[in-house]
Amino acid sequence: MKTLYSRRRFYHVETLFNGTLALAGRDQETTGFAWWAGNARLINLSGKLLGAHVAHAGLIVFWAGAMNLFEVAHFVPEKPMYEQGLILLPHLATLGWGVGPGGEVIDTFPYFVSGVLHLISSAVLGFGGIYHALLGPETLEESFPFFGYVWKDRNKMTTILGIHLILLGIGAFLLVFKALYFGGVYDTWAPGGGDVRKITNLTLSPSIIFGYLLKSPFGGEGWIVSVDDLEDIIGGHVWLGSICILGGIWHILTKPFAWARRALVWSGEAYLSYSLGALAVFGFIACCFVWFNNTAYPSEFYGPTGPEASQAQAFTFLVRDQRLGANVGSAQGPTGLGKYLMRSPTGEVIFGGETMRFWDLRAPWLEPLRGPNGLDLSRLKKDIQPWQERRSAEYMTHAPLGSLNSVGGVATEINAVNYVSPRSWLATSHFVLGFFFFVGHLWHAGRARAAAAGFEKGIDRDFEPVLSMTPLN
């Protein structure tokens, strides 16, 4: 295969390497990268790079299957999922598998099947990864030109992009088909405290779906994270899946326009940086979604959101004190504002106390008590159902706050319960990983742009002092 660029110009940072550790000819002399630079050694070996990626997919799927079975083995049906440190079973339950009314787990067998299927898949991927890493052809261009590529071949790169987009679109439609035809998904808003249901009346109106993108990210607006009904979520997946598939077909059939050829850097490291940037955005959005959204991430499985736990505490004490004879409509708190209820600046009736900052919370156990002007006093006096009391008392004591005292007014006690909410884990991990991916995006973008501009970054390796020193061994 003809190399389209000089190695010196493209591999602009050379790394020190102990030659005795050369692996199958992929040493620093032949690649410009040391063993610890990992897959960078395989930039021009498409067959070996395929092996690395397939093996990596095998590791990911193996973790999913093994962790899935671990959670099934430790699962106690009598306790809520969020009390058991589970992060995978809540996702399966949200998809409607194994759960019934109120999010109660009625069958763990689907979870077991999911774990086993992932383990079997990981074995296939693992075998493929080892085969392509050790036995398969080093490069695919000669024997399998369809799967071969040169990083600078812009047309081939957009074709690969198109194939990826089509696969993502199919993934989005898998959720749509599950919700429409294959048993439905769990809806936390179903009457009486949540249930699995098929989604029949999809929201396909572009003004509603794309209206989410135009909303402010702040306060009661909340951008796309504010979505609170499954019709909109599944309808959004129809739109996303369609856009991905049509965009994929477009990128397969067309060549990049002149402005794109000029504006973008066309090298392996540049594509890596673009991908890391996209994943960073996904991570930050996922962080906000799992922290604030209790429709896509139902509180029955993931535990309450922070605002939800705070509002649940206000509601629980309102119920208690109302039973003890308090007039919750007029009682004053220590600041002179309403102790149980007050008005927001725009006039809605909201819970009083520190939880006032979370006045815009929407939760299935609370919404039935609202009227046209916020919380309805007559409903609070006459219509509170036992399931609402039970759920709010449960959520009050399971805030996703660790043991910080008085966050949003939630009374926490470090000795009370050994509990970390899955929302805390998932939100924190996705924020931290999203940040790392963003730094990786900046790093690889800088290297790729430097290489494209034809200059090297870093110290001059030819006259580096360490080269004149005795080897360690």
Curated annotation (Swiss-Prot):
A Pfam family matched in the record: PSII
Gene Ontology molecular-function annotations: chlorophyll binding; electron transporter, transferring electrons within the cyclic electron transport pathway of photosynthesis activity; metal ion binding
Any GO BP: photosynthetic electron transport in photosystem II
Binding residues for [CaMn4O5] cluster: E367
Localization per Swiss-Prot or TrEMBL: Plastid, Chloroplast thylakoid membrane
InterPro entries according to UniProt: PS_antenna-like, PS_II_antenna-like_sf, PSII_PsbC, PSII_PsbC_sf
N-acetylthreonine: residues carrying this PTM: T15
Topology of this chain in the membrane: Multi-pass membrane protein
Cofactor remark from the record: Binds multiple chlorophylls and provides some of the ligands for the Ca-4Mn-5O cluster of the oxygen-evolving complex. It may also provide a ligand for a Cl- that is required for oxygen evolution. PSII binds additional chlorophylls, carotenoids and specific lipids.
Subcellular location, principal: plastid
Phosphothreonine PTM sites in chain numbering: T15
Record keywords, A-Z: Acetylation, Chlorophyll, Chloroplast, Chromophore, Manganese, Membrane, Metal-binding, Phosphoprotein, Photosynthesis, Photosystem II, Plastid, Thylakoid, Transmembrane, Transmembrane helix
Residue ranges annotated as propeptide in the record: 1-14
Gene Ontology CC entries for this record: chloroplast thylakoid membrane; photosystem II
Functional note: One of the components of the core complex of photosystem II (PSII). It binds chlorophyll and helps catalyze the primary light-induced photochemical processes of PSII. PSII is a light-driven water:plastoquinone oxidoreductase, using light energy to abstract electrons from H(2)O, generating O(2) and a proton gradient subsequently used for ATP formation.
Family affiliation: Belongs to the PsbB/PsbC family. PsbC subfamily.
Oligomer status and interactors: PSII is composed of 1 copy each of membrane proteins PsbA, PsbB, PsbC, PsbD, PsbE, PsbF, PsbH, PsbI, PsbJ, PsbK, PsbL, PsbM, PsbT, PsbX, PsbY, PsbZ, Psb30/Ycf12, at least 3 peripheral proteins of the oxygen-evolving complex and a large number of cofactors. It forms dimeric complexes.
Name of the molecule in the record: Photosystem II CP43 reaction center protein
